[in-house]
């Protein structure tokens, strides 16, 4: 989550550095979470410094595969070219890993049992040809309270978005900042 600290924007701490073509595993996720925790304890995670969600504890958390919130920004392809948006989205980059495979790893490890929300962003998430398959892969029967938040410019109609809205699976946040 983004926030300001001493007039500087912070947040957006990257959990896993992706290598082209290599899908992260649950073990990668656990190791990355532990590394970020250790960096925060040593004040070496600049992106997190000043975050109001941090708190002191004497108990080191367990780094299991459990996911409470998941933000998926696996590509930066967009169908607009807004002047306020970062240039990395102009033209965009495709995903470096198989997102469906990663979601399946999480499913197999019962990671979504306590998950509240999965957020889809990064460019225009509905442009991914596997968007419907990926969103549908998260087993909602494991946690009926889980929902998906899709950040979209809502310029392009997508059958899956309508279906997911009708089924109550997703909520959309439309970004129409008149930046085009």
Where are the language model's segments positioned?
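Processing junctions and N-termini across compartments
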Residues: 41-45, 72, 76-79
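Leucine-rich repeat
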Residues: 98-107, 132-134, 160
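A short acidic (Asp/Glu
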Residues: 62, 82, 129-133, 159-162
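A generic secondary-structure signal
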Residues: 105-109, 137-141, 163
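Core AdoMet radical
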Residues: 67-77, 86-100, 112-129, 141-158, ...
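Short pre-active-site segment immediately N-terminal to redox-active cysteine/selenocysteine motifs
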Residues: 47, 55, 77-81, 88-89
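Accessory C-terminal segments flanking Radical SAM cores
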Residues: 1-58
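Short, non-ligating residues that shape and space the ligands of small metal-coordination modules
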Residues: 57-60, 91-92
């Amino acid at each position: 989550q983004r926030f300001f600290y001493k007039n500087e924007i912070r947040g957006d701490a990257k959990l896993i550095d992706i290598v082209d073509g290599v899908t992260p595993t649950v073990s990668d996720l656990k190791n990355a979470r532990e590394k970020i925790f250790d960096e925060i304890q040593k004040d070496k995670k600049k992106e997190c410094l000043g975050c109001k969600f941090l708190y002191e504890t004497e108990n080191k958390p367990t780094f299991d595969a459990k996911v409470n919130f998941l933000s998926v920004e696996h590509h930066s392809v967009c169908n607009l070219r807004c002047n306020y948006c970062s240039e990395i989205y102009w033209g965009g980059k495709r995903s470096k890993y198989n997102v469906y495979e990663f979601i399946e790893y999480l499913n197999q490890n019962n990671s979504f049992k306590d998950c509240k929300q999965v957020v889809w962003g990064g460019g225009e998430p509905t442009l991914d040809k596997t968007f419907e398959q990926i969103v549908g892969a998260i087993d909602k029967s494991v946690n009926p309270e889980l929902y998906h938040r899709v950040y979209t410019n809502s310029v392009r109609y997508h059958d899956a978005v309508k279906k997911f809205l009708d089924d109550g699976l997703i909520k959309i946040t439309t970004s129409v900042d008149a930046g085009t």
